[in-house]
């Protein structure tokens, strides 16, 4: 049996997105300021997933425009070699959040080719005088014929964008890391 992973961000497990239950697969402190958690449906693996939810939480201030620009440029750089790469930016009506959604494709030497659709939601917050920055992302992969996969994902885009916009982000509290003494 898989050992239960404990959420460093105090997020309930499982979470539900787009009528699918996602279970915490990994929770890591990547640096002094970055905590990352990845959730996948029950019978999937990080190596070969169809859907993935990612929470990347920075307990420091990050400039929203910079984070958005970096994500957009990452996709734009792929566009030269990846004919399925395409990126869009959407600002929330109140201007407090941004969504970056994009398509990309991979044709690995070993393994199945896939097209992946990602939505990143960027949100700044503050707790106890401490500024924080959160990226919530959802990825959906379809393996196999790239043209079919791209068409199929494109048809889901509006629904998935609405689902992400309406998604109630859980309250995040960084668990006190044990110092190991």
Where are these regions (language model features)?
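Mid-chain, structured segments of secreted extracytoplasmic proteins
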Residues: 49-90
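Short, hydrophobic/aromatic-rich segments at coil-to-beta transitions
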Residues: 93-101
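Sec/Tat-exported extracytoplasmic proteins
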Residues: 26, 75-82, 164, 168
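Secretory pathway targeting signatures of secreted, lumenal, and periplasmic proteins
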Residues: 20-60
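Sec-dependent signal peptide cleavage junction
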Residues: 1-5, 175-181
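Short, well-structured beta-strand
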Residues: 101-179
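Short N-terminal edge-element motif at the start of the domain
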Residues: 2-26
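Hydrophobic/aromatic beta-strand elements that line small-molecule binding cavities or substrate pockets
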Residues: 38-41, 86-90, 115-126
């Amino acid at each position: 049996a898989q050992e239960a992973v404990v959420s460093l961000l105090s997020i309930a497990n499982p979470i539900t997105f787009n009528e699918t239950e996602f279970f915490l697969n990994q929770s890591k402190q990547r640096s002094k300021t970055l905590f990352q958690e990845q959730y996948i449906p029950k019978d999937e693996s990080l190596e070969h997933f169809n859907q993935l939810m990612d929470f990347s939480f920075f307990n420091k201030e990050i400039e929203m425009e910079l984070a958005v620009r970096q994500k957009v440029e990452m996709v734009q750089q792929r566009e030269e070699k990846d004919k399925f790469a395409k990126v869009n930016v959407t600002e929330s009506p109140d201007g407090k959040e941004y969504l970056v959604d994009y398509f990309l494709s991979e044709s690995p030497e070993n393994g199945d080719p896939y097209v992946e659709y990602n939505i990143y939601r960027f949100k700044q917050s503050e707790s106890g005088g401490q500024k924080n920055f959160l990226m919530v992302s959802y990825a959906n992969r379809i393996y196999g014929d790239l043209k079919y996969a791209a068409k199929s994902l494109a048809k889901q885009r509006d629904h998935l964008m609405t689902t992400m916009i309406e998604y109630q982000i859980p309250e995040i509290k960084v668990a006190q890391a044990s110092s190991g003494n």
